[in-house]
Amino acid sequence: MYGDVANKLVLEAKRTDHLANGSATLQLPMFQDEMVRVILKEVSQLQRNAEYLKLQEDSGKLSKCQYFVTMLCMERNKRCLLAYQKTRSEILDAIAWENNGLDTMDLLSNKGHDSGNLSPYEQEYLREYSQLISDLTAGELMDIDLAGSLTPPSDVFIDVRVLKDAGEIQTEYGVFNLIKDSQFFVRQADVERLIQQGYLQKL
């Protein structure tokens, strides 16, 4: 029946979103190439049906209703495809920003992720988007932390605990020697990146 595969694809998009939001590291499951192909084939079949119904001489209520339902099915399939692609592209964007635009395909392989989970178009998108980020961060905006949080901190100074040894860190307010299990009261802006990298834990 029309729309069944599109519903499965929407469920896959929800699963992908829950998987990305529920884990510490961003992950993408295998791209559902077969489902996407079936939906595209279904859309082209619906398009042919709609064109046939539009050309019918008899424009009674029945043919108008058939045409309307066919167009609704086609639009729903397209929306489901776009929702699936948008979910995956948002996760790819987050992966690229998390790695500051470094060669993300190599990093994915090193972290145990299979880049084969991405379609060829997604691989190209991720590579080019990562290149844009690295160009931005290496140019005139080098001094600005573009990967930082967009929400302002609620507290200027925070308590942090050191999770991993990191050596001496120079900040605006002095030098901190980050030794495992030690605690500091520091300015949040100075240690935001270390928290993201897993060296510090906000208390």
Swiss-Prot record:
Keyword Nucleus: yes
Chief location: nucleus
Segments crossing the lipid bilayer: none
Subcellular location, record wording: Nucleus
GO cellular component, one term: CMG complex
Gene3D superfamilies: 1.20.58.1030
Biological processes, Gene Ontology terms: DNA strand elongation involved in mitotic DNA replication; double-strand break repair via break-induced replication; mitotic DNA replication initiation
Keywords: DNA replication, Nucleus
Pfam families on file: PSF1_C, Sld5
Keyword Signal carried by entry: no
Top-level taxon of the source organism: Eukaryota
Family under the similarity heading: Belongs to the GINS1/PSF1 family.
PANTHER family to which the protein is assigned, alphabetical: DNA REPLICATION COMPLEX GINS PROTEIN PSF1, PARTNER OF SLD5
Functional note: The GINS complex plays an essential role in the initiation of DNA replication.
Subunit field text: Component of the GINS complex which is a heterotetramer of SLD5, PSF1, PSF2 and PSF3.
Protein name in UniProt: DNA replication complex GINS protein PSF1
Gene encoding the protein: PSF1
